Amino acid sequence: MIKPGDVISYLEMCTDEGVNLQRGMNFHLRGDVSVILMSLRPNAPYADRVEEDGHVLIYEGHDVSKTQDTPIPKIVDQPMNNPGGTLTQNGLFYKAAKEYSSRKKHPELVKVYEKLHAGIWVYNGIFKIIDAWQHTMSLLSMAPV
């Protein structure tokens, strides 16, 4: 059994979860268990962070996929809904947080793994999803003087 703080391989992580983890957000992956894969490494694609001595995690969510129509996913709002209207992973986690904050449900539990290096992860434990928000990032273009 993997315990918080254990450093494990990608294969061990997938074996423990019983699935081949491919995306960062996995809402109710198996039953009521959700899984988040995060990275705090330099040049990580998302601005995930840890606050309050490891008691609070801020997870940025999923960008849209890079396509010919969206060559720079960071300039497109992270979608809450799929084209067919169902909730995306962003939408599912957001809804769960809002249902908790409005006292409609207990907080969702999420297992968090943090990428240390290619193929090497640390299990950070189980966290409660207690809040979610959307915020606008501005992209600044600078030209040399």
Describe each PLM feature range.
Residues 1-122:
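Acidic, glycine-rich low-complexity segments with interspersed aromatic residues
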Residues 116-145:
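Compact mixed alphabeta submodule
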